[in-house]
């Protein structure tokens, strides 16, 4: 109730992994009239006019039919209807991804390091295109690129780091396709 009554931006990460009993409580918060009843306290609280609620979901609330996001649930259509704005985010541009990787790996912020990171991002982009086209079933996220960079620093071997960070997660039948990237 505290966040609801204050100028807070509340973010529910992996919203579609929420339990249905919790989701029904949240449904009332999504109503536009700005009131919420605390039954255990016999009290009605009013929403702060600057309170904002955000959520992230890999399945956009439609559930997972692919098996990629095990543990997610289909969100009740009435609740999905209460979200006034729903949007999709694509992957970052190569430049933005580069900036994030370099910010987390300052030792790579030099000509040689930038070239290595640029090549890693190109490989990641190829896996994303392969995933979208249905050629491969595992995608390299920006988090995976960060892990690949970290592991390449640990092992001092970009190829080995690629295998332990990404390739070992892939289906054996797809490894030849990935090798072409």
Question: Over which residues does each language-model region extend?
Answer:
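C-terminal regulatory/interaction module of P-loop NTP-utilizing enzymes
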Residues: 1-181
